[in-house]
């Protein structure tokens, strides 16, 4: 029983570490996108935003991807492009 608990705690710690790494990657990408947008002329920003939104509109998600996940991604991309981090 102790071995099972130890193994479960180890797996939980590994999952937590993986989660921290993913959060760090997302935050780094947010910073990069924000910096890039801020250094672009307004018309270039708008052009990029429209290109990304058009690309998303043209993508059909796999049937195994829940609609909620697809909508969450779309909302997050829109938020990031239209209202970048401060």
UniProtKB/Swiss-Prot annotation:
Biological process terms from the Gene Ontology for this record are: cellular response to starvation
Q: Which GO terms describe its cellular component?
A: cytoplasm
Q: Which domain of life is it from?
A: Bacteria
- Specify whether Lyase is a keyword of the entry: no
Give start-end ranges for the coiled-coil region(s).
1-36
Is-annotated flag, keyword Cytoplasm? yes
* Matches recorded under Pfam families: Anti-adapt_IraP (PF10796)
Main localization, broad class: cytoplasm
| Subcellular location, record wording | Cytoplasm
Tell me the keywords, alphabetical order.
Answer: Coiled coil, Cytoplasm, Stress response
Q: Which NCBIfam families match?
A: PRK10244.1
HAMAP family referenced in this protein's UniProt entry, alphabetically: Anti_adapt_IraP
In the record, the note on similarity to other proteins reads:
Belongs to the IraP family.
Cited function: Inhibits RpoS proteolysis by regulating RssB activity, thereby increasing the stability of the sigma stress factor RpoS especially during phosphate starvation, but also in stationary phase and during nitrogen starvation. Its effect on RpoS stability is due to its interaction with RssB, which probably blocks the interaction of RssB with RpoS, and the consequent delivery of the RssB-RpoS complex to the ClpXP protein degradation pathway.
| Assembly | Interacts with RssB.
- Give the protein name, as stated in the record: Anti-adapter protein IraP
Instruction: Please give the organism.
Output: Citrobacter koseri (strain ATCC BAA-895 / CDC 4225-83 / SGSC4696)
């Amino acid at each position: 029983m102790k071995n099972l608990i130890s193994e479960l705690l180890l797996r939980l710690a590994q999952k937590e570490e993986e989660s921290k790494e993913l959060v760090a990657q997302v935050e780094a990408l947010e910073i990069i996108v924000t910096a890039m947008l801020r250094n672009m002329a307004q018309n270039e920003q708008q052009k990029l935003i429209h290109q990304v939104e058009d690309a998303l509109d043209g993508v059909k998600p796999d049937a195994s991807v829940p609609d909620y996940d697809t909508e969450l991604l779309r909302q997050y991309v829109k938020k990031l492009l239209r209202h970048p981090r401060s």
